[in-house]
């Protein structure tokens, strides 16, 4: 048997495998062939882990040094969320963050990925100021995948397009319908129509 073995696991990987094990389809409507393989993988993984210590990598395996540069507070929150989700996925206790004395492997990260992450992160932050809908925070968590240095160019481009579309759709969920108003004094009641397609309430401050 192997002793003193430590596991570092990205919760996004396990969640994707769990989704596969629940059944999936490949466009247009062909049933995926990996359902049984995914189910068996989860069984084998839990058996292999046994009582070994498990550490949760940040969701999406972003380059830690780069992610922390954006915000230490956000990174701490990401570590906490990642450990909770991995523990739920594996059905056992895990530790947030990397084990002691663990050193991140030096890997170059695409400047395009960093730029895309910076832009989309900023847009999500603005959207989150008016709505606390869970889909916003979920998108923000998944966005960290863009900072994964293991992504090849094709995967990076696909994710960038996918996340850009997702963030744009979120931005379109909250909008003010256009109208023409005549203001005759400093204080007026203006009939403004605001459309909120989020499930959660939104708080909007309009400045004229």
What are these regions (language model features)?
Residues 1-208:
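N-terminal membrane-targeting/anchoring modules of bacterial envelope and secretion proteins
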